[in-house]
Each structure stands twice: as C-alpha cells, then as structure tokens.
From Swiss-Prot:
Name listed for the protein in its UniProt record: Protein PA-X
Family: Belongs to the influenza viruses PA-X family.
Biological processes, Gene Ontology terms: viral RNA genome replication; viral translational frameshifting
InterPro entries: PA/PA-X, PA/PA-X_sf
Free-text domain note: The probable endonuclease active site in the N-terminus and the basic amino acid cluster in the C-terminus are important for the shutoff activity. The C-terminus acts as a nuclear localization signal. The C-terminus is recruited to host protein complexes involved in nuclear Pol II RNA processing.
Species per Swiss-Prot/TrEMBL record: Influenza A virus (strain A/Brazil/11/1978 H1N1)
Amino acid sequence: MEDFVRQCFNPMIVELAEKAMKEYGEDLKIETNKFAAICTHLEVCFMYSDFHFINEQGESIIVELDDPNALLKHRFEIIEGRDRTMAWTVVNSICNTTGAEKPKFLPDLYDYKENRFIEIGVTRREVHIYYLEKANKIKSEKTHIHIFSFTGEEMATKADYTLDEESRARIKTRLFTIRQEMASRGLWDSFVSPREAKKQLKKDLKSQEQCAGSPTKVSRRTSPALRILEPMWMDSNRTATLRASFLKCPKK
C-alpha cells in the first residue's frame, strides 16, 4: 500500500501526510491504510478548492487558467494540510476578520462566499453513516459538512453541495479511479476491512515489490490549491517541485 500511495499521489501530498502522521506519533510503515486515507482526504480538499475564485463583484467564478490581470480572491481558504499551530492561527485570523464563530475542532476549509467553515469527509462506508458521525462529533450548525464516497455518492448539510456539478464530478471520478487502481492491485479489500488490512500488512512486510518499477505519469495541470499552501509550508528552493501537478496512478 505504501508503494501504491507514493506512486499515485503528488509528492507534496505524500509529504504533508507523512508530517501529519509524524505529528500524531503514527508510523506510516504500519498504518499504511491511514496513510492512504490521509493522502486521499488531502487531495479531495485541494480539488475542492481548485479553480474557484471570487471576482470584484463578489461573485463566485471558476477560472482554470491564471490571468495576472484578473483581480480575483480565492474562494476557499485551505486549513487542512497545515500543522496544528498554523492551522489554528489561520482559523483565528478568519474568525477575527469575518466574525465567524470559532469551531471547536479544526475544519478543512473556509468558504468566503458562503462565510462558513467546511468539514470534508471521504468514506469507504455508507455516506449517511459517516455524515452522522461527523455531525455528532462537531455538534455545530455553523460548520458545513460535505461527505464523498468511493462509489460516487455524496451527502452535505441541508443538501447544499457548495460546488457546481462538474467540480464535484471531478472529485468523484478521482475517488473512483483510486478505488479501481487499489482493486487492480489487490489492495481495496484491505483498505476497507481492518481484518483484511492485517493480512495485507503481513504481505507488505514480506515483499515490497508492489508497484515497484512502474513508470509514473505526471499530469501537466497545475494545482492552484498547492500553490496557495506554498508560503505556509514550502521553502523557495522547492517551488518548482510544488508546481508539479497531481500524479496519476501508473497502469499495470
């Protein structure tokens, strides 16, 4: 699973996931499923934000190409992917600026158009079950919840899906692709079932040949979301690497 993750996700996403697991004292060599889940969640958060801006009139627009002459503001503030101290600093700044109620738990995004924090969920189970778990944990009507599944289902607070259908379809397609790629490598069952995960871990410890030697294909599309995070967690020497867009899983 670890090899699969490193080949199928952008290196910057992988690095963020590694830092997150290290921050919480988790070993990615053992918790490989969690490693994959964190990378998936990070990518969904970045895709959620990608290409969405607010123009001078305060309208939400989608721009896929950078226009240096356009006076645009990013619609979403990305909180996920930052270390806890910096994340809370961003949240406090947003609350002080917008008057938003400070959430009890760290959310994933802030939507400047709708003026609300957003909690993104990616589940391997039924969306309504995971939604209820999130809602019971957060216990706040102020934080908007949006859940995606690997089967193309989604659920959001008051059926308000925030994004346009095309943007959501892009996320669903990516999740479905990840599922298919995992299944083709015999990793999906262990990703879904803890019991199967233990069996897979034993296999992984015996052999690290899974996905080894496969060529990695790089899409040339730039991820604006990753660019937003650059000042917060990247140094200038790695800007070129940052600008590399999301990696696609190599075909068998």
